[in-house]
């Protein structure tokens, strides 16, 4: 499992490339909400640069370096608030019919995001993995038009698609 809250596809691709260095998954499940999450041009460029030049990823780290960082024992003290979870015990159900009313239209997927998804699929194929699209239940972020958009993309790419928002 490799995911973070509000993850964009540029970061998904970066994490997937890193995972493939040590792992050989048989199935890769891509949560579809990210496919509709806009990746701003500036962020896409920065992510690509950070993959190739560590100075962009760790550009402020030099300010806090000490000799102990080079010579001492490694202490992993940094945490990323986007990774992990927040325990939340409240349960509030919903009626799927309220937000998943069938429509004929399909929500448009940003072209840049389609390119990211196709790159993920290419890496899956090269590494013997099957790409599966999954829409987790989400009455706030999901609707039938988005379902139709992902369904069309899945058919075009030959991917399996599971939408848990449907009855």
Listing of model-derived features with the role each one plays in the protein:
Residues 24-27, 125-132, 157-160:
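Loop/turn elements at helix/coil->beta-strand transitions in domains of secreted/extracellular proteins
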Residues 2-4, 31-33, 134-137, 164-167:
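Active-site-proximal beta-strand/loop segments in catalytic clefts of secreted hydrolases
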Residues 13-19, 119, 146-149:
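A short acidic, amphipathic alpha-helical/loop segment
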């Amino acid at each position: 499992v490799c995911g973070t809250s509000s993850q964009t596809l540029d970061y998904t691709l970066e994490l997937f490339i890193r995972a493939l260095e040590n792992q050989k998954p048989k199935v890769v499940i891509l949560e579809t909400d990210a496919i509709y999450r806009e990746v701003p041009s500036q962020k896409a460029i920065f992510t690509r640069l950070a993959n190739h030049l560590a100075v962009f990823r760790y550009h402020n780290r030099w300010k806090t370096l000490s000799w102990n960082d080079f010579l001492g024992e490694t202490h992993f003290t940094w945490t990323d608030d986007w990774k992990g979870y927040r325990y939340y015990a409240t349960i509030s159900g919903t009626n799927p019919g309220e937000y998943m009313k069938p429509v004929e239209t399909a929500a448009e997927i940003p072209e840049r995001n389609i390119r990211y998804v196709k790159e993920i699929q290419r890496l899956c194929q090269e590494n013997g993995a099957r790409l599966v699209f999954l829409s987790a239940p989400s009455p706030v972020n999901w609707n039938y038009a988005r379902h139709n958009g992902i369904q069309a993309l899945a058919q075009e790419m030959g991917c399996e698609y599971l939408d848990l928002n449907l009855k």
